Structure formats: C-alpha cells, structure tokens
Amino acid sequence: MSPTPAHLNFITGNKNKLAEVQAILAGVIELRNENIDLVEIQGSVEDVTTDKARRAAEAIKGPVLVEDTCLCFKAMNDLPGPYIKWFMQSLGAAQMHKLLAGFDDKSAQAVCTFAYCEGPGHEPVLFQGRTDGKLVESRGPTAFGWDSCFEYKGQTYAEMDKSEKNKISHRGKALEKLKEWLAQKVDA
C-alpha cells in the first residue's frame, strides 16, 4: 500500500462543493483546489468518476480527488442520474419537481462518488455515499445545486444547518469512507 499523500488536489470549479468538502475533511488531510476542464464521458457514475480521476491525475501529475454527483428518481428508473447537472442548467431548482408531476412516487436518491487517484498510471479508488429522500418544490436558499428541492426527513438540504447536512448527506457519507481509507493507509 502506498503512503498517504501530504495533500490532495481536489478537482472542482464549484466553490460550494469545495467549501463543503473542505469542511468535512478539515483536520484529516490538506486539500488543495485545481479547476481543470475535464472531458466527461457518458456512462455510469462509477465509470464517469473513474475516468475523471485518471484524466485529472494525468493533468496534475500527482494525487487527485474528483467527485461526481447523481440525483436518481425511482419513478424514472434512476434518471437523471449522472446527468443531473444538465437538467439543473435547463430547469433550475425551482422547476425540478415538475419532472415527477405525473408520478405518484416522488422518491429520490442522492448519490455521491469520489475517486482518489495516486497519480498517472494508478487505478482510482472509489468512495460512494447514498442518501434516500424525495423530490419536492424548492424550499430554502437556491445557491447550491438541487439542495433546495431534495428533502430528507422533512427538510430540504438547503433548509438544514451545514454541519447537520454534512453528517447525513450523500457527500458526507462518501467522504467518511475516504477518511476511513486514509486512516487505514496511515496505520499500515
């Protein structure tokens, strides 16, 4: 097993995502940010994230952390899934709930997949978190993606305190797995 890196280059141009990941990983590992425009393949979230990690590691020539997020609607056989970004750009959070207007089932699953890649030529390691909820009309601040229309136990992500959200969110769950993995590398 390779040693734990001194820092990780988190590849994202999303300042809200960066702040959330920094908050969750605070005190665990130094997180640096790189905003690289990566080609994003179409496929499963695992395939997309793995490919992004390989491309980013090649570009950075060192250890990277990348992330891909899905929002899956049971009534639509898990669509939009990894393509949620494009739905959000077209509809926005205020209109997202209309996608399920013709369905009784409003259940949704938020899925976050991180990939760590040690560097060029190394196989990425995946860490995935999932949170079950439902799609609702937008409530709360709309500054962070679909947080205002994804409800977990009566509150949208946007209505939650950030530290509370980070404990139960798909991203928080995935990063807990990453933290456990990093701790095992230190202990090895």
From Swiss-Prot:
ITP binds at residues 12-17, 52, 68-69, 85, 144-147, 165, 170-171. Binds 1 divalent metal cation per subunit; can use either Mg(2+) or Mn(2+). Mg(2+) binds at residue 40. Its cofactor is Mg(2+); Mn(2+). It catalyses: ITP + H2O = IMP + diphosphate + H(+); dITP + H2O = dIMP + diphosphate + H(+); XTP + H2O = XMP + diphosphate + H(+). One of its GO terms (biological process) is nucleotide metabolic process. Gene3D superfamilies: 3.90.950.10. Keywords: Cytoplasm, Hydrolase, Magnesium, Manganese, Metal-binding, Nucleotide metabolism, Nucleotide-binding, Nucleus. It is an enzyme of class 3 (hydrolase). Its EC number is 3.6.1.66. GO terms for molecular function: dITP diphosphatase activity; ITP diphosphatase activity; metal ion binding; nucleoside triphosphate diphosphatase activity; nucleotide binding; XTP diphosphatase activity. It comes from the Eukaryota. GO terms for cellular component: cytoplasm; nucleus. The keyword Magnesium applies. It is found in: Cytoplasm; Nucleus. Pyrophosphatase that hydrolyzes non-canonical purine nucleotides such as inosine triphosphate (ITP), deoxyinosine triphosphate (dITP) or xanthosine 5'-triphosphate (XTP) to their respective monophosphate derivatives. The enzyme does not distinguish between the deoxy- and ribose forms. Probably excludes non-canonical purines from RNA and DNA precursor pools, thus preventing their incorporation into RNA and DNA and avoiding chromosomal lesions. Homodimer. Belongs to the HAM1 NTPase family. NCBIfam families: RdgB/HAM1 family non-canonical purine NTP pyrophosphatase (TIGR00042). This is Inosine triphosphate pyrophosphatase. The lineage of its organism: Eukaryota, Fungi, Dikarya, Ascomycota, Pezizomycotina.
